[in-house]
């Protein structure tokens, strides 16, 4: 069997979203990595400017988070607002301070210029918890979680 490739004939377009990246709370990907408040290389929100610029340069189209094994024990409500709850991550066996959460992730995606792709916790989470997260991120101002986002300084939905 022989195939002939006609490079002048396009049969469709490839979505740039096929070539995304992900970050996870593993070793130094986030803490002491892309998110490092107090580091001289970090901006006013704690994001490493050099890493943000590198991600812009390679044109990351979509960034998945909380990504990998970490998501199976991540409870988003503990990483939002003023009273954050640290937790022991069973996958990586480390204490996570939860200082990088939903709002920080969305801010980071905006700085990079990429689409956020939020993974949900199907390991120890519930469908209701996932639904609450959708409300927090996407509803304008109806519901307690949308109002919580507004109280946290984000007037507009993230979608």
Segments from the language model and where they lie:
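Non-catalytic accessory regions flanking glycosidase/transglycosidase catalytic cores in CAZymes
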Residues: 1-159
